[in-house]
Amino acid sequence: MPRSLKKGPFIDLHLLKKVEVAVEKNDRKPVKTWSRRSMILPQMVGLTIAVHNGRQHVPVLISEDMVGHKLGEFAATRTYRGHAADKKAKR
């Protein structure tokens, strides 16, 4: 169920401060964050945000299409290695 419109988007304050500083300085370095739950705001467009996936920080270049989504949607936490091969098909 989506968040109520009267509450507005959620973003961690420490991440918002880092984004504001990066926009102000026109900094090209990735902004490192562990906050996967924060929503992508229009002021983040064009920034590279390094989102933690539980093991490492995955760089995510924010585009216009990503606004309104959560940061965690773009940094996969699980590694898919494929299903086991069918033993009958090998013969």
From Swiss-Prot:
Keywords assigned by UniProt, alphabetized: Ribonucleoprotein, Ribosomal protein, RNA-binding, rRNA-binding
UniProt xrefs under InterPro entries: Ribosomal_uS19, Ribosomal_uS19_bac-type, Ribosomal_uS19_CS, Ribosomal_uS19_SF
One GO CC annotation: cytoplasm
Top-level taxon of origin: Bacteria
Pfam families: Ribosomal_S19
Stated role: Protein S19 forms a complex with S13 that binds strongly to the 16S ribosomal RNA.
Protein name: Small ribosomal subunit protein uS19
Organism: Azotobacter vinelandii (strain DJ / ATCC BAA-1303)
